[in-house]
Design a protein with these regions (language model features):
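Bacterial N-terminal signal peptides that target proteins for export
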Residues: 1-7
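Predominantly soluble domains enriched in secretory-pathway, periplasmic, or organellar proteins
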Residues: 5, 20-350
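Short, linear, compositionally biased motifs with a strong N-terminal bias
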Residues: 10-13
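C-terminal motif of bacterial Sec signal peptides marking the signal peptidase cleavage site
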Residues: 15-18
């Protein structure tokens, strides 16, 4: 396929490439279930998507390849289902796939700014728009016609969430070790410009907002030395930032009824990973709800946490060497299933 180059007039100069790709009739997505995105290993071009059915406890591996006859790419970063379409960010391959529910490619979106390709990271969606962070310092807004606007934010933006009429973008500065960034950009959804920045802990990563827009939660990795990982909350009415009392936070995920699931990990004195622990937090009242797992299940090499539309909580476990395991929990904190993701580093369930 030869991409078509579209030159658009926006607040910043950039280029968007779009590819359409028909596929044979190979449906992989049932009436209910969850996509599992395996990030893969950097440089190995081995990201993939499988489909898990929690009712049948069945898993169809590499469903994207089955639908399209091509590999997904290098380092799968995020997956979003919105308005009957699936969006997949492939970071190192610097592309976004837009597919139907069976993972058949409808569009492939490659963005440029100032003559350089951009690397997509994390999605959010609101008001018929899909937003995506680009690691080169931009937030993108994708419209239904696949046109794209860009807004310059801070260095190496990662997570993004919507609270009220604003987008909150975590500027990690992840490529500037050991002098990481420590800001969150506040971007208006109306003007699509950066309105302000808020200082937080260094190396901010994931963002989640309460449904009433009152609170925005930010997890950060710290500098891996004297500044530890943290979970903080921004009160949007006054941009105040408060530390929450969770230790070694590695990932967060917003669930139903404004419950925030907090995955905490860490290492022993010999740098061996400790089993993950999950806590719950009420996002609307900003109050702890205690431990999540109620049946004693342990989570070795915990890597990621997601809450899917099916209501189950998915925890990806990975040693970065062999195929990962995914633990599936009910909202009551009991293990529903465990399966081999048949890929490296299961990073997201949706």
């Amino acid at each position: 396929m030869k991409p078509t180059k579209l030159i658009l007039s926006i607040c910043l100069t950039f280029t968007l490439f779009s590819c359409e790709s028909p596929a044979e009739d190979t449906p992989v997505h049932g009436s209910s279930g969850t996509y599992i995105l395996n990030s893969g290993n950097w440089g190995d071009n081995d990201a993939n998507i499988g489909f898990y059915n929690p009712t049948e406890k069945s898993f169809a591996a590499d469903a994207f390849y089955a639908a399209n006859g091509q590999k997904l790419g290098d380092v799968g970063q995020d997956i979003l289902v919105y308005d009957d379409l699936v969006y997949v960010a492939i970071n190192t391959s610097q592309t976004i796939f837009v597919t139907d529910s069976d993972l058949k490619i409808k569009k492939q979106l490659d963005a440029e700014a100032d003559g350089a390709r951009l690397s997509p990271r994390v999605f959010a969606a609101h008001g018929n728009k899909v937003y995506v962070t680009y690691y080169e310092g931009y937030l993108g807004e994708i419209s239904k016609d696949y046109s794209l606007r860009l807004c310059a934010v801070g260095p190496n933006p990662d997570g993004v969430a919507i609270a009220g009429d604003n987008l909150y973008v975590a500027n990690s500065g992840g490529m500037s070790y050991p002098t990481y960034n420590n800001t969150v950009s506040v971007v208006s959804t109306d003007s699509f410009t950066e309105a302000s920045t808020i200082e937080v802990n260094v190396n901010p990563a994931m963002v989640a907002a309460s449904s009433d827009g009152k609170y925005v939660y930010i997890s950060s990795f710290g500098n891996y030395a004297d500044q530890p990982a943290k979970l903080q909350v921004i009160t949007t009415s006054n941009a105040g930032v408060t530390d929450l009392e969770y230790q070694s936070v590695s990932a967060i995920a917003k669930g139903k009824n404004d419950v925030l699931y907090i995955l905490c990990g860490g290492y022993d004195e010999n740098w061996n990973p400790l089993p993950g622990t999950i806590y719950k937090h009420d996002m609307k009242t900003n109050s702890p709800l205690g431990a999540f797992v109620t049946d004693g299940t342990t989570l070795p090499n915990s890597y990621s946490i997601s809450v899917a539309a099916d209501g189950y909580i998915y925890v990806g476990c990975s040693d970065y060497k062999t195929t990962g395991d995914v633990y599936v929990f009910s909202k009551e904190g009991k293990l529903h299933d465990k399966f081999d993701s048949q890929g490296l580093n299961p990073i997201k369930a949706f």
